[in-house]
């Protein structure tokens, strides 16, 4: 099947930081063509037939807020748009949210383990209310890849966040943690329609049967294709969906249509991609 493809989950860095970004996550590689920089993402997109990628910057330290988002803004192209990074403990977080709105960022990315925050903590309720007011879609790293970490977030935490931000699209990365190490106390049941999951790393970590079972239970209308470039492979993640037993219409929902609907609500869907 041939259709549009939107990759909701990619990461690119300045050249000076790209190698370090790979080392920190245990993906050290000396091949320049495999570094997470814009030129390499564009090349992988062309190879995989991806029409649009969303860059997800991570602000690991509050003092890096401005620098990280300036780079994210500067690196955007017609086929690469960017969410803004936000550290919940940055000074004047409400003001920083207004800045991200002024910068016309497409949404907000959080990574609790890297940022060392419990996003569901009541002290962040004001931040979540402001995000809800501004209408930002949010994409959050979920679960853990290798070992359990103190700040890992699971669906139970999302349920708490929804009390302060009930209206915005919330995208739970890594299939809501279920393509990572399993937490037997967690599930994806009874989450509202504005909560989505992406497929980042699922092609690499999930068996095909389990991958499809999770999606069928959650609903193809709430699943977004994501590769987690450079840590995941765009071609493999796309093939996992295309080779599945879902209908062509359901595959299109996951590969681009669901993401397009979210991006359209914030005016970030390119004109060449029509719903």
What residues fall within each predicted segment?
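A cross-domain feature marking catalytic cores of carbohydrate-active enzymes
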Residues: 10, 57, 84-88, 110-112, ...
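Conserved, mostly hydrophobic/aromatic
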Residues: 9, 45, 72, 100, ...
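Catalytic pocket-lining loop regions of alpha/beta-barrel enzymes
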Residues: 106-107, 120-224, 272-274
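Active-site gating/metal-coordination segments in enzymes
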Residues: 51-52, 62-146, 152, 205
